[in-house]
Amino acid sequence: MFCVQNLPRSSALPLQSFKSHQRRPPCSVNTLGVMSNVNLHRSMAVKAISGPTSSAETSDANVEEEKSETYSTNMTEAMGAVLTYRHELGINYNFIRPDLIVGSCLQTPEDVDKLRSIGVKTIFCLQQNSDLEYFGVDINGIREYAKTYDDIQHLRAEIRDFDAFDLRVRLPAVVSKLYKAINRNGGVTYVHCTAGLGRAPAVTLAYMFWVQGYKLIEAHNLLQSKRSCFPKLDAIKSAAADILTGLRKKVVTLTWKNPDCTTLEISGLDIGWGQRIPLQFDEEQGLWILRRELAEGCYEYKYIVDGEWTINENELVTSANKDGHVNNFVQVFDDNPDSFNANLRKRLTGDDPDLSMDERLKIRQFLESIPDEEQ
């Protein structure tokens, strides 16, 4: 029998805990899901490939296509929407506002020139080193080239790919850095992750919601009218509530009664779909057990039993996404559902959240107070 327990012990982390939180790099990729194509971009900047190609060039192109297909497959399953990224086509982007662009990653130093030509003053990269290495992007070469100009700045603020909880926890520090860069550099800001379909849209939405005065749904509708993408809105909502109420945690215990299996792991929760945590077998109880501190919020997860991904049908299960995938999930609540903080979090994590003038001012002041990260 598998059960979920919310134990009474809890902890509250001060707002300062957001200062420079860094997460581990991801492990390989998730292996569930099916890839499908979607019309992503209404306006694109595409590399032109012309003339005869050698067998080596053809082989390299095939490798790039295979990497893109693998990445798209994993993005589709992790984001819960059918998404495609073609790295071999070059950088692509969309203006969301006259001063804000969301796009895919820079691939060569020449991409810096492309962005300078459209008025970009800040290039804001959300990729981790592992993301760059996967597609063979020379980030150091790009950054060094950008430094040869005095009218554009390249900044990095890493968020782990395919990880909604890392996005939630990192958003305050990342948006703080973006906010300060925009105030300092002016002009047009180019926000990108790898494909420009998850992390970059989410950071841009958080900035529009927290700083520019948009309601979240209004900002999201504007974004979708310019660029088809799938930002994790729940992470943005929870991050806003975390700033205003503090990041409170509770211990959650997951148990599974299956003494016949050899290994039992869990993926999702607060570690993302690219990583796994092993459950420990308690011989006395005959149970596989995992105890983990989780912040308030909703967490999806799956089990890997002797290498096979599965859910427990006796526990809470999400609705099927477009590809038919379902996950288990657990909701972590405040011990006092009638408290001011609980009601504030409930409002901010609802379907159509908005911030009062006072709440938005507090968030801006908090963003300004976060020490600058390197890079």
Swiss-Prot record:
Keyword Nucleus: yes
EC number: 3.1.3.-
Cross-referenced SUPFAM superfamilies: (Phosphotyrosine protein) phosphatases II, E set domains
List of residues binding substrate: T194, A195, G196, L197, G198, R199
A molecular-function term among this protein's GO annotations: phosphoprotein phosphatase activity
Keyword Plastid: yes
Main location per the UniProt record: plastid
Keywords carried by this UniProt record: Amyloplast, Carbohydrate metabolism, Hydrolase, Nucleus, Plastid, Protein phosphatase, Transit peptide
Tissue expression: Expressed in phloem parenchyma of 16-24 week old seedlings and 2 year old trees (at protein level). Expressed in leaves of 16-24 week old seedlings and 2 year old trees.
GO cellular component, one term: amyloplast
Conditions for induction: By cold stress for at least 9 days at 4 degrees Celsius.
Organelle transit peptide residues: 1-42
Annotated stretches, region: Disordered: 49-71
UniProt-annotated stretches for the region Polysaccharide binding: 254-330
Subcellular location: Plastid, Amyloplast; Nucleus
Enzyme class: hydrolase
Biased composition (Polar residues): 51-61
Active site: C193
InterPro entries: AMPK1_CBM, DSP_laforin-like, Dual-sp_phosphatase_cat-dom, Ig-like_fold, Ig_E-set, Prot-tyrosine_phosphatase-like, Starch-Glucan_Phosphatase, Tyr_Pase_dom
A Pfam family of this chain: DSPc
Domain (Tyrosine-protein phosphatase) ranges: 92-249
GO biological process, one term: starch catabolic process
Role this protein plays: Starch granule-associated phosphoglucan phosphatase involved in the control of starch accumulation. Acts as a major regulator of the initial steps of starch degradation at the granule surface. Functions during the day by dephosphorylating the night-accumulated phospho-oligosaccharides. Can release phosphate from both the C6 and the C3 positions.
Domain comment quoted from the record: Contains a C-terminal polysaccharide-binding domain which interacts with the phosphatase domain; this interaction is required for glucan phosphatase activity.
Protein name, per record: Phosphoglucan phosphatase DSP4, amyloplastic
Taxon lineage: Eukaryota, Viridiplantae, Streptophyta, Embryophyta, Tracheophyta
